[in-house]
Amino acid sequence: MNNLTDLEKKINSELGTKINSTKIQHNQIYVEIDKEDLIDVTLFVKTNKDTKFRQLIDITVVDYPEQSQRFKLVYLFLSHEFNQRMILSYNISENEVISSLTSIFPSANWREREVFDMYGVSFKDHPDLRR
């Protein structure tokens, strides 16, 4: 999909109930989900012929200490085929355990370890979660 508007429509139509919101800003698509939908959404955007987000560029956290869901997990994906970036995010409370993406993107290994080390966010099924 060469057009971000078409990409947004595709993601919303295919993943409707798993998507909380989408927007196009700064020539990127921003997608907000619930943590329970991370694996399904990630598999779709990586493997679907119209999305092809086959590179995980980064995983980071934004800390909002005044909010009950203190942490926002942010994943940055790149589609080389379509030259597009997608920012996928969701909020969690302190001490929640979330799914690891290492089985889908092996490069998530180090990035998830860094998030664990810096923010204490634990990843379920991570092969080597240590500081």
Locate each region found by the language model.
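Terminal low-complexity/charged segments
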Residues: 1-131
